[in-house]
A protein has these predicted regions:
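Secretory targeting signatures
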Residues: 1-25
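Generic "edge-of-domain/loop-turn" microfeature
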Residues: 6, 16-19, 42, 73, ...
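Short amphipathic alpha-helical "recognition" segments used for binding
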Residues: 7-8, 22, 46, 213-215
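Short, solvent-exposed secondary-structure boundary motifs
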Residues: 14, 52-58
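Glycine-rich phosphate- or other oxyanion-binding loops that anchor nucleotides, phosphorylated ligands
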Residues: 29-33, 57-268
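Short, conserved "active-site rim" segments that organize catalytic pockets and cofactor/ligand binding
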Residues: 30-50
Length: 268
């Protein structure tokens, strides 16, 4: 009887250890890839192709939790502009276990060689509207806005994600339609040829948009790798509004296809 009881206790102990071990593994938080954009049409294709488990809503912003191309993902549309983009990615990084961030969407073209529907993969980002406005005009100031120091004017994308995005874009669009370079961020929709030339000469920019640098700053603060990919819907000139209306959805889908190509490559 004593031997049977001893064996029973040992079996129970082994089962307890096994169950605890399994529970511990199950409780490990899932690592997600964060995908963020500014507008609905920039994530429509991704949501159509994704398997969404559930949707969390924080401060009226929806976070779609699920999988895409075999990868666990969180997809969100932050809204337009630097403030909304910073808020959206901050919430994402605080609420979920995010391993890396991909910002996808459309932009205005700045470089002469980059045409509508071409893709720009950001090597770095800069806030072109950060500076001092005096009687002498606007003077751009380098540095990290809000901190009073000057660690550098540009925010560098993660080199591994940058290369992954570039390779994916080349596969989707062809090498002649893909560029790597600086993306300039500001809280304006640029439709002015003269200002486009300034962005090119002052920052060596290839594209301009309204969110990327804000996402970059937050990701750097959280030590989270990130990349920004932008399809050109217009040339940020006097015809920008018309071009955006004609090509915005197609450009947005191009960026989404590149994101999916990246996710597939991550699983190889």
């Amino acid at each position: 009887m004593f031997k049977k009881l001893t064996v029973l206790i040992m079996v129970c102990a082994m089962l307890f250890v096994f169950v605890c071990g399994c529970t511990q593994k199950t409780d490990e938080p899932t690592e997600y890839i964060g995908i963020i954009s500014a507008m609905d049409n920039e994530i429509d294709l991704l949501l159509k192709e994704a398997e969404i488990d559930h949707v969390d809503t924080v401060a009226d912003v929806k976070y779609y939790v699920g999988s895409l191309c075999g990868q666990p993902i969180i997809i969100t549309r932050s809204g337009i502009g630097k403030i909304r983009a910073a808020s959206g990615v901050t919430t994402m990084l605080n609420k979920y276990n995010i391993s890396k961030v991909i910002f996808t969407g459309i932009a205005g073209g700045v470089a002469d060689e980059a045409q509508v529907l071409d893709e720009v993969i950001a090597t770095r980002l800069v806030e072109h509207d950060y500076g001092i406005l005096s009687n002498d005009g606007f003077k751009w100031r380098s540095g990290d806005p809000g901190f009073g120091n000057e660690p550098g004017a540009y925010y560098e994308c993660d080199p591994d994600l940058l290369q992954l995005a570039y390779d994916a874009a080349v596969d989707v669009l062809g090498e002649e339609h893909v560029f790597k370079g600086t993306v300039a961020t500001g809280d304006q929709f640029i439709a002015n040829s003269e200002y486009v030339q300034k962005l090119r000469s002052d920052y060596d920019a290839y594209a301009c948009e309204m969110e990327g640098a804000a996402v970059a700053v937050v990701c750097l603060q959280y030590n989270t790798p990130f990349v920004v990919i932008r399809a050109l819907s217009d040339k940020a000139d006097g015809n920008a509004h018309e071009s955006y209306e004609n090509f915005g959805d197609v450009a947005a889908d191009n960026s989404s296809r590149i994101v999916m190509k990246m996710l597939n490559a991550m699983g190889e």
